[in-house]
């Protein structure tokens, strides 16, 4: 039976990759009248997002350590100490029964404080390669959830990524429909290649807000729909026969849940090259085609699109669905509400 009086602190901040999966869990927890509060950074996008969902937000001073200059590294111990004191104060005031960490700086500090306070610590890793924070916290966490198999060696349950996604039945298209997703800010290297496509297919290109007008003017193909954003991704996946995109954890999970075949171009400078490893999960299961950005050419891309057939697309789509984990939110929420 659920303990609806349980106080739960969710720790996630900085980027959408941490925030939106955590928010999916938080909104489900709220249905059970749980006492939910949020720990984030003072600089992350959570400051604009979380208050809109009627969740109390605590913020601490953000201190990133990877890729910083010497001066920043000298300041880091003092800033870390201050941030730790801020988190301790939050714990003493809220007295959480369980904390959920989604990775990133605030999750790291909060997770260590939870361990010191002997508070139940649950973590979730969204990528196939764990971030530094979760590598550390996995050793002390009460429970670890992972989106993909074999991310951690010990103490981990594969749940999938906690996203709210309701797939729509695929359309039956006569001509190949290619959906290109550039991410919220777009992807200039991908845009420069795909705008050269001059084959008889339908293209829907989500460019990001910075590139919509430029990309639209560069296309040779007249059957192109260019939009800065796509708000209804389920409809877009239903329209698409195949998607060309980066390999962020949420995108890969959506491809699985929507049973959509894909051409994946991992971001080459992603931390620990995690996008490559995310993409490899789909390609290893014959659910996607992996192309490194350095190898992407118009000739290669046109060759793939001209030679792929409906049966191959159907098989890739089926394979993607086979490795999907549609119950991640419920699985994690159930654990949070019944754990001691």
From Swiss-Prot:
It catalyses: di-trans,octa-cis-undecaprenyl diphospho-N-acetyl-alpha-D-muramoyl-L-alanyl-D-glutamyl-meso-2,6-diaminopimeloyl-D-alanyl-D-alanine + UDP-N-acetyl-alpha-D-glucosamine = di-trans,octa-cis-undecaprenyl diphospho-[N-acetyl-alpha-D-glucosaminyl-(1->4)]-N-acetyl-alpha-D-muramoyl-L-alanyl-D-glutamyl-meso-2,6-diaminopimeloyl-D-alanyl-D-alanine + UDP + H(+). InterPro entries: GlcNAc_MurG, Glyco_trans_28_C, GlycoTrans_28_N. The keyword Cell cycle applies. It is a peripheral membrane protein. GO terms for cellular component: plasma membrane. Gene3D superfamilies: Glycogen Phosphorylase B. UDP-N-acetyl-alpha-D-glucosamine binds at residues 15-17, 127, 184, 230, 275. Signal peptide: none annotated. One of its GO terms (biological process) is carbohydrate metabolic process. Its main location: membrane. SUPFAM superfamilies: UDP-Glycosyltransferase/glycogen phosphorylase (SSF53756). It comes from the Bacteria. One of its GO terms (molecular function) is UDP-N-acetyl-D-glucosamine:N-acetylmuramoyl-L-alanyl-D-glutamyl-meso-2,6-diaminopimelyl-D-alanyl-D-alanine-diphosphoundecaprenol 4-beta-N-acetylglucosaminlytransferase activity. The keyword Cell division applies. Keywords: Cell cycle, Cell division, Cell inner membrane, Cell membrane, Cell shape, Cell wall biogenesis/degradation, Glycosyltransferase, Membrane, Peptidoglycan synthesis, Transferase. Pathway: Cell wall biogenesis; peptidoglycan biosynthesis. It holds the Pfam family Glyco_transf_28. Its EC number is 2.4.1.227. It is found in: Cell inner membrane. Cell wall formation. Catalyzes the transfer of a GlcNAc subunit on undecaprenyl-pyrophosphoryl-MurNAc-pentapeptide (lipid intermediate I) to form undecaprenyl-pyrophosphoryl-MurNAc-(pentapeptide)GlcNAc (lipid intermediate II). HAMAP family: MurG (MF_00033). Belongs to the glycosyltransferase 28 family. MurG subfamily. This is UDP-N-acetylglucosamine--N-acetylmuramyl-(pentapeptide) pyrophosphoryl-undecaprenol N-acetylglucosamine transferase. It comes from Vesicomyosocius okutanii subsp. Calyptogena okutanii (strain HA).
